[in-house]
Amino acid sequence: MTPLDILILGASYGSLLATKIVLAGHNAKMICLPAEADLFNAEGAIIRTPVKGRDGLVEIRTSGLAGQLSAGGPADANPAEFDLIVLAMQEPQYSSPGVRDLLHSVAESCVPCMSIMNMPPLSFMKRLPNMNIDALRPCYAESNLWDAFNPEKFTLCSPDPQAFRPPEENLNVLQVRLPTNFKAAGFHHAEDNAMLRRLQADIEAVRFTTDDGDTIELPVKLKVHDSVFVPLAKWAMLVAGNYRCVQSAEMRPIQAAVHTDIDQSREIYNWVVDLCVSLGGAPADFVPFEKYANAAQSLGSPSSAARALAAGAKNIERVDKLVQTVAAQKGLQLASLNETVALVDGWLEKNRAAG
C-alpha cells in the first residue's frame, strides 16, 4: 500500500508522533520554526524513551527509517496534499502570523484533522452532545479560528505520553518521561477511521533493533476508540495535577501537586471524571485515580503550563477554565477548581501588565 502522508503542525511534542509515523513506514512533515526545520532536515528527530524491561533509555533516530521525515515553515505546505493533519502546537500559537493562515487552509482542505493538544479545539467540542459552544468561546485565545472546520472531519487524541526537550540538547532531541499511549476518538466517517486504524496497526507492528542488536517492541502506540469521550480522560489529570502546579508565588512539580494532599487530589480528579460521565462518557473511558497518582510520582517538574506562566507567558492553554465552564452548563462547580482558575488568571494578568 502507498504510505500515508501526514502533516504535523508543531515539532516539539509533534516530533514524538512523527517518529512513530516514520517508524511505521509512513511520511511526516512537521511545521515549525526555521532553526528547528533546518535541524530536523539535516539530522532528523532523536527520541529517547524508557522501555519496559530495559535499563536506561533507548534512542531512536528517524534518519534511515522506513518513512521520510521533513520539516518546514507555515508557507511550505499545501494541506490538500496530505492524508491526515495533526495539530500539535499549544492552542495560543495558532494565532501567530503564518500559522493562522495555514490553519485556515487546513480547515478549507477538508482533510481529516486530529488534535493532540491538551486544549480540545472548539471544532471537537461541537461533537459532544448538548454543548453550548458560544459559552466556551472565552476559554480560547481566538475561538473563531476553529469555526471553519467541519466537526465530522475533526477528532481529538489525548496527549498522554509525557515528554520534554532536554535543555542542554539540540531542538531535535525529545526525551520521553512517561511512555503511555496516544488515545484517539474516531472520526465521524468510516473511511477516515479506516485510515486512522491502519496507522494504529502499522505503529503496533513496528519492531526496533537497538544498538546492541536486540529486536524490541517500542512503547507509545496510537489507540483508536469509538467513544468521543476517551480523549477527555486527560481533563481530570490536567485539573488535578498540571494546573495545580500553579501557586500564588511559585510553581511546584506535578508530583507535589498530586501527592501533597492526596485526598483533595482524588476528590478533584473524580469530580472531573463524574462531569465527563454526566456529558455522556462511560466510566470505562477514564483512567482510575490510583493509576494516575502512581504515574504522577515520576513527574518531578512543574507542568508546561506552569513553567510558561513563570517565564512570563501572556497566553496559555486554559483547560482549567474550559472544564469550569463546561461544568457550569451542568449547574456544577468545585471550589478548588475555582481557586486554580483564579490563580492562573492572576499570573496571566501580572504577565500582561509587565508588557
Predicted regions and their residues:
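NAD(P)+-binding Rossmann beta1-loop-alpha1 motif at the extreme N-terminus of oxidoreductases
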Residues: 1-52, 122-123, 219
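NAD(P)-dependent Rossmann-like dehydrogenase/reductase catalytic/cofactor-binding core
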Residues: 2, 168-180, 194, 198, ...
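Domain-wide signal for the mature, well-folded portions of proteins, strongly enriched
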Residues: 5, 84-93, 283, 319
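Short glycine-/acidic-enriched loop or helix-start segments at secondary-structure transitions
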Residues: 17-18, 96-99, 124-126
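Short amphipathic alpha-helical segments and helix-helix/interface helices
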Residues: 18, 37, 99-104, 324
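Conserved N-terminal Rossmann-fold NAD(P) cofactor-binding segment
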Residues: 29-82, 103
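Rossmann-fold NAD(P) dinucleotide-binding segment
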Residues: 76-121
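Rossmann-fold dinucleotide-binding core
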Residues: 80, 114-241
